[in-house]
């Protein structure tokens, strides 16, 4: 009886070398589960070029490896970013930073319904903000401005002019320090759901009779999806949206 090969653990996955993405320009590109499905379907189509098949495989491997490294760096039990998780919710967006044609950073965002404590009334209010769900830059590339490049690109692509309107899922002390240094965000009330919403998140808001937080119309309001006016780059039959050169 043949023995089944041992399952690859997240630790081993995190130790893998990130593959070279020769068809992905250096800079920031945006991917969703639907984009990855389209890339997979194109790769499986009869007559697909070997380079296209190679791109799909290496891009998915890059996402899984960086997601595993993020999990390891944060010392958490569950992986936050993987191809499988992106396919589970196609509304989530993954911003991938590549340098020298290799992935060096990821930033995952998506809209979620949350109940958070209002810092003034101390009562629970319902909100549906754009959330930062995972943020990681490879250790070998930290303190070189890549994190700011990735975060700034995401804010622009998501039409967020005020970073304080985002909710942050379980931020590490390093991420809190990053937000304090670059965006002056510091004061917040701890939430039972482990999301961080800064006190300035509640600026220019009111609470409805049903307890829903209402934000005054503003350019700072995050759109669920970037506008079609943003640049796209065709890559192997799929589109890397909102690409910004490195």
Curated annotation (Swiss-Prot):
Disulfide bonds: none annotated. The keyword Transferase applies. PROSITE patterns: GNAT_ATAT. Transmembrane segments: none annotated. Its EC number is 2.3.1.108. InterPro entries: Acyl_CoA_acyltransferase, Atat, GNAT_ATAT. GO terms for molecular function: tubulin N-acetyltransferase activity. One of its GO terms (cellular component) is ciliary plasm. It comes from the Eukaryota. It is an enzyme of class 2 (transferase). Residues 21-202 form the N-acetyltransferase domain. Keywords: Acyltransferase, Transferase. The keyword Acyltransferase applies. Acetyl-CoA binds at residues 135-148, 172-181. The record marks 74 as: Crucial for catalytic activity. It catalyses: L-lysyl-[alpha-tubulin] + acetyl-CoA = N(6)-acetyl-L-lysyl-[alpha-tubulin] + CoA + H(+). One of its GO terms (biological process) is regulation of microtubule cytoskeleton organization. Belongs to the acetyltransferase ATAT1 family. Specifically acetylates 'Lys-40' in alpha-tubulin on the lumenal side of microtubules. Promotes microtubule destabilization and accelerates microtubule dynamics; this activity may be independent of acetylation activity. Acetylates alpha-tubulin with a slow enzymatic rate, due to a catalytic site that is not optimized for acetyl transfer. Enters the microtubule through each end and diffuses quickly throughout the lumen of microtubules. PANTHER family: ALPHA-TUBULIN N-ACETYLTRANSFERASE 1. This is Alpha-tubulin N-acetyltransferase.
